[in-house]
Amino acid sequence: MLRYPADVSPFMAVPADPTPQDWANALSLIGAGHAIVFAPSPLTPSIPAVSQGLGLVQMVARDVTGALDPEVEQLTYADVPEILALTALTKPGPFLDRTIELGNYYGLRSDGHLVAMAGERMRAPGWTEISAICTAPEHRGKGLSVRLIRTLVHHINDRGEQVFLHAVESNPAIGLYESLGFEVRRRLVGTSLSAPT
């Protein structure tokens, strides 16, 4: 049973075929908060306070061209308040106070304000996930996300790693990702676990 620190990410890993004791251990790790577990099919935890059914696709970059962009800046801890405001507005997925510690995050600004961002989240040997791809509503349709994705692909590929991402099945950005050269690798289901109140 593994999970990220609660202020970094809500994600948790459980064994492929969890036992009741595994679920009890999961609850003890969750504490008073919540966690999200991803699996190829819905899980049926033997614990209370479970929310099922977040369908996701996992996509891999099969033929995505990376490129550096002189206007894209690397974000730092000093940018976290702006990052949290942008992610609260756009809801690209969980972004918490310390999520920036998971990898490199990049942004684009307009009149000094952060208006688009994306970064690195989960890692597996030879692979890095692109996450938190978001653009403020008034700046959508300008290709900002594409520029950020290409920047991340460049940096990740430059390290000799492959790129993947996750998206909610209903996310219209999936079409954009496919147009850039991403392919659906598999479907997943997210299960949210909360400690009983």
Question: Whereabouts are the PLM-identified features?
Answer:
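Short amphipathic alpha-helix that is part of the acyltransferase structural core
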Residues: 62-93
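Acyl-donor-binding surface of acyltransferase catalytic domains
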Residues: 1-68
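Conserved beta-strand-loop-alpha-helix junction that forms the acyl-donor binding cleft
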Residues: 38-42, 155, 164-175, 190-197
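Recognition helices and adjacent regulatory flanks at domain boundaries
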Residues: 108-109, 121, 142-155, 162, ...
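Conserved acetyl-CoA-binding loop-helix of GNAT-fold acetyltransferases
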Residues: 20-25, 135, 141-158, 174-179
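A conserved beta-strand-loop-helix scaffold within acyl/acetyltransferase catalytic domains
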Residues: 94-104, 108-137
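Conserved active-site alpha-helix within GNAT-family acetyltransferase domains
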Residues: 43-48, 146, 169-186
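Conserved catalytic-core motifs of GNAT/GCN5-like acyltransferases
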Residues: 51-61, 183-197
